[in-house]
UniProtKB/Swiss-Prot annotation:
HAMAP family: RecA (MF_00268). Can catalyze the hydrolysis of ATP in the presence of single-stranded DNA, the ATP-dependent uptake of single-stranded DNA by duplex DNA, and the ATP-dependent hybridization of homologous single-stranded DNAs. It interacts with LexA causing its activation and leading to its autocatalytic cleavage. ATP binds at G73, P74, E75, S76, S77, G78, K79, T80. The gene is recA. Keywords: ATP-binding, Cytoplasm, DNA damage, DNA recombination, DNA repair, DNA-binding, Nucleotide-binding, SOS response. GO terms for biological process: DNA recombination; DNA repair; SOS response. It comes from Prochlorococcus marinus (strain MIT 9312). Its main location: cytoplasm. InterPro entries: AAA+_ATPase, DNA_recomb/repair_RecA, DNA_recomb/repair_RecA_CS, P-loop_NTPase, RecA-like_C, RecA-like_N, RecA_ATP-bd, RecA_C_sf. This is Protein RecA. GO terms for cellular component: cytosol. Belongs to the RecA family. It holds the Pfam family RecA_C. Transmembrane segments: none annotated. It comes from the Bacteria.
Length: 365
């Protein structure tokens, strides 16, 4: 008897044993408790748009559904604005969003100006960190909410700290709270398909001479459990003469489990208006040579359309038919795998293979 003939009965016995154990696991723990990865119905990670085309591209489509996302950065860098745009995108597509306002600082007028349906936005202003995270867990387990934003981790104050005296030291209480919460809610997030975005603040490590002294609050648990971590910074103040009208923000994808990490996206945030979607479109149109810049002038199909970036954005906003045509052409070029390499997507320069094809991305919101 050949070696192959000897192996065949062993293989059949293994397959039979595997079928028996899989059946036993499903009877004990329910259907879907174990499966072959190729049989999984959710192999492709769906995404929620960030509201900024350049950032969607850097993330591989947007915020992944059913995952934890952390957005951190210094004060006034655009963290809350970024998440309010995500809420607006979810609502635009008929989804339900919730905002857990631990900082008690949500401005409904500003949120409405960014396109948020404030009448239907679920808002909670919890008294303690435990209360906030319990509310988050219950919203996730309902499977009726598509996006939950927690603003912010630094404001999730443990009950022991609130009930104690002002000078009391409750060492590590917030880190323990976050660690327990992440263990509890992560599994539920994956099952429900709800995206949870935690906003976080920066602190400085004491006594650090070499390396980056910055760290985020709430311990290390969130860093491990987050599928995506975004580092957002203000890099420029936008001015017309002496009047400041917005900021230029840079976002580095510090961690990404669903697409290549370390990409960088830049976009404008206008005071009172939020992310400049037309500005993002102009950046990508210029990079894909749909709109050509020569000196201060921008041209489209051989005709000058604006002198300076601001005037070109205004022209595109006023000529919606051409704007929509440019947007379609940009998406088509990205679908073809055209390399995008300039200030807004610097991280793609090092490897053209990193360019994301839009047809490989499934965006649902």
């Amino acid at each position: 008897m050949s070696l192959e003939e000897k192996k065949k009965p062993e293989s059949k016995e293994k397959d039979k044993a595997l079928s028996l154990v899989l059946g036993q696991i499903e009877r004990n723990f329910g259907r879907g408790s174990i499966m072959r990865l190729g049989d999984a119905s959710r192999m492709k990670v769906e995404t929620i748009s960030t509201g900024a085309l350049t950032l969607d591209l850097a993330l591989g489509g947007g915020y992944p559904k059913g995952r934890v996302v952390e957005v951190y950065g210094p004060e006034s860098s655009g963290k809350t604005t970024l998440t309010l745009h995500a809420i607006a995108e979810v609502q635009k597509n008929g989804g339900v969003a919730a905002f857990v306002d631990a900082e008690h600082a949500l401005d409904p007028v500003y949120a409405a100006s960014l396109g948020v349906d404030v009448e239907n936005l679920l808002v909670s202003q919890p008294d303690t960190g435990e209360m906030a995270l319990e509310i988050v867990d219950q919203l996730i387990r309902s499977s009726a909410v598509d996006l939950v934003v927690v603003d912010s981790v630094a404001a999730l104050t443990p009950r022991a700290e609130i009930e104690g005296e002002m000078g009391d030291h409750v060492i590590g209480s917030q880190a323990r709270l976050m660690s327990q919460a992440m263990r509890k809610i992560t599994g539920n997030i994956g099952k429900s398909g709800c995206t949870v975005i935690f906003l976080n603040q920066l602190r400085l490590k004491i006594g650090v001479t070499y390396g980056n002294p910055e760290t985020t609050t709430g311990g290390n648990a969130l860093k491990f459990y987050a599928s995506v971590r975004l580092d957002i910074r203000r890099i420029q103040t936008l001015k017309r003469g002496t009047e400041e009208y917005g900021i230029r923000a840079k976002v580095k994808v510090a961690k990404n489990k669903v697409a290549p990490p370390f990409r960088i996206a830049e976009f404008d945030i206008l005071f009172g208006k939020g992310i400049s979607t037309t500005g993002c479109l102009l950046d990508l149109a210029e990079e894909t040579n749909i709109i050509i810049r020569r000196g201060a002038w921008y041209s489209y199909e051989g005709e000058n359309i604006g002198q300076g970036r601001d005037n070109t954005i205004i022209w595109l906003d006023q000529n919606l038919e051409i704007r929509n045509k440019v947007e379609s052409m940009v998406k088509e070029k990205l679908t073809e795998g055209t390399e995008v390499s300039s200030n807004s997507m610097k991280a793609l320069n090092s490897n053209p293979a990193n360019t994301i094809a839009v047809n490989d991305i499934k965006t649902v919101a």
